[in-house]
UniProtKB/Swiss-Prot annotation:
Glycosylation site list: N151
Main location: membrane
UniProt topology in membrane: Multi-pass membrane protein
Superkingdom field: Eukaryota
Designated gene of the protein: TwmF
Entry's Gene Ontology cellular component terms: plasma membrane
GO MF annotations in UniProt: transmembrane transporter activity
Cell compartments where the protein resides: Membrane
Protein name: MFS-type transporter TwmF
Length: 549
């Protein structure tokens, strides 16, 4: 069997195929996917500003972390299953199901009367969100050749960036003027529009010959069960490590070890005949560059959430910005990812090489995160805005070029499993991108409190042992006298500095790994069993060509 790299070499010696061009249906599908991605992106960040108000209203206490983690957990653990479902039942119905699940979860969150109901709604939302974002990339991969894929990924990235940027802004505005419940109710009309749009235009091929029970037998039930259970165990450990339980406690170590052991067993089963249709075939990770891309996908995803969850802490507890103003102040970290993604996509399409893009992008991220360590009480608007722009531009370049690079090493028939694996790694990185800086932040806060950095014992008790993140708001700080405010702001500032000091190491390692990447030719033709349902002439026939013709 020929490898993708050898296929690329054969293409260079054969006549160039006619340039691929999208038609109306492709654009219509991209618009529909854009609306669904806007939904998912908004919900990823909308609570970064609104969280303190929501948590106080529902009296969640120490369980507040599950409002975020339930979303991450379900969106990550379900990805391999969604990828396999899309191969078995087709992209159309699985995507429509994901949108419906997301809207259902949003309704439950908006109507939540208890913390448990909110957490359950967030878990359901996460299932839909993970499916929406991952399936969008699978569908784009079915419709667009690898060499041109970056352009369409940039479109979705721009929408994700706009949604991520609007999330804190909308969340802050809604909390300040209406009710936090509309943070979730807003998804209902938008979700309805996206469902109708995709129902009309998303008509792509799938295997209609197999019976329902034949399709069910193809599902790797054991593999999916292990992945879900392992992800739950790891996230449970990370949720309470350093807050309810010490990192060295058996309450933390046992679920953490069980989770990683489960993932190790899962990886082993993927190489055996026990998995007739593996979720993540080991052939995806045979090339050294594939392994590097997987590691750097994890790191870049972790660094993104590192910033999204701790920049608001700096803005609200150190700069004393209101939720609405903090939402506006986060615009650079989200919006500057858009031109970064476009530059990365254009470079990928123009030269067909991802290594130079990754080197430059991770260099920018490392520089920007280093500048974040300069954050203090008197940091100017120009400083924090420019520093965010540097990190965001590099992150945008990484996002649009990492998946096409990872897909370059696999055949088109594996596109769904490959994309699901990549997104699983990425969302797994999001989980650690909250857990690692949170542990660093809490540890630094406790150390400073132990040194007597805050003179008022009641304040120290409030923000000790993991309470600092929940209390990170201007309203909390401003209720105290001026001298005590300065002490609180100083403690938060020093903790934030330590958080970003550690992030430099992660970005630096990723930068060094990019130097070891090897470029592989990106395919200019497309062979897929999941092309557009309605065949056209000329170029469209080439797009819909089947791998087994």
């Amino acid at each position: 069997m020929k490898s993708p790299s050898s296929s690329a070499e054969m293409q260079s010696s054969s006549p160039e195929p006619a340039p691929w061009k999208p038609d109306f249906q492709v654009y219509a599908i991209v618009i529909g996917l854009g609306i669904t991605n806007l939904l998912a992106a908004l919900e990823n960040t909308v609570l970064t500003i609104a969280a303190p108000v929501v948590l106080t209203d529902l009296e969640l206490g120490e369980n507040f972390i599950w409002v975020t983690n339930a979303f991450f957990l379900s969106s990550t653990a379900i990805l391999p299953l969604f990828g396999q479902f899309s191969n078995i039942f087709g992209r159309r119905y699985v995507m429509l199901t994901a949108v419906a699940i997301f809207v259902l979860g949003s309704g439950l969150c908006g109507g939540a009367s208890t913390g448990a109901m909110l957490i359950a709604g967030r878990a359901i939302q996460g299932v839909g969100s993970g499916g929406i974002i991952m399936l969008s990339s699978i569908i784009i991969s079915d419709l667009v050749p690898l060499r041109q894929r970056g352009n369409f990924s940039a479109i979705l990235m721009s929408i994700l960036g706009i949604g991520s940027a609007l999330g804190p802004l909308i969340g802050g505005a809604i909390v300040s003027s209406i009710s936090w419940r509309w943070v979730f109710y807003l998804n209902l009309p938008i979700g309805g529009v996206s469902f109708v749009f995709l129902f009309i235009f998303l008509r792509v091929k799938y295997n209609k010959e197999m019976t329902f029970w034949q399709k069910i037998k193809r599902i790797d039930l054991v593999g999916n069960a292990i992945v879900i259970a392992s992800t739950v165990a790891i996230l449970y450990a990370l949720s309470y490590a350093g807050t309810r339980y010490p990192w060295r406690s058996w309450h933390t170590l046992v679920p953490l070890l069980v989770g990683f052991l489960g993932l190790f067993i899962f990886a082993g089963l993927q190489t055996t005949a026990f998995s007739a249709e593996p979720l993540m075939p080991t052939r995806f990770f045979r090339a050294p560059t594939s392994i590097i891309l997987a590691i750097n996908t994890f790191v870049s995803a972790a660094l993104l959430y590192w910033c999204l969850f701790f920049l608001p802490v700096f803005l609200q507890s150190v700069k004393l910005y209101s939720p609405r103003r903090a939402g506006v102040a986060l615009l650079p970290i989200s919006l500057l990812g858009i031109p970064g993604s476009m530059v990365g996509a254009i470079a990928l399409v123009r030269w067909g090489r991802y290594k130079p893009v990754h080197i430059f992008a991770f260099a920018l991220q490392t520089l920007g995160l280093g500048l974040f360590t300069l954050f203090r009480e008197d940091t100017s608007v120009a400083e924090w805005a420019v520093f965010q722009c540097i990190v965001a531009f590099g992150g945008g370049m990484i996002f649009t070029t990492m998946l096409p690079a990872f897909q370059a090493f696999i055949h088109e028939r594996d596109i769904a499993a490959c994309t699901a694996a990549w997104y699983f790694i990425r969302l797994f990185g999001h989980i650690w991108g909250v857990a690692i800086p949170a542990a660093i932040f809490n540890q630094r806060i406790d150390t400073l409190l132990g040194q007597g950095a805050i003179s008022d014992p009641s304040v120290s008790k409030t923000i000790a042992a993991g309470g600092a993140y929940q209390a990170a708001s201007a309203a909390f700080v401003k209720q105290f006298p001026g001298s005590l405010q300065l002490e609180i702001r100083s403690v938060y500032s020093q903790a934030i500095q330590r958080v970003f000091q550690v992030s430099i190491a992660f970005a630096g390692v990723a930068f060094l790994l990019t130097l070891l990447e090897k470029d592989v030719g990106l395919r200019k033709t497309l062979e897929t069993d999941f092309g557009l349902e309605k065949e056209g002439a000329g170029q469209q026939a080439d797009v819909e060509g089947r791998s087994h013709e």
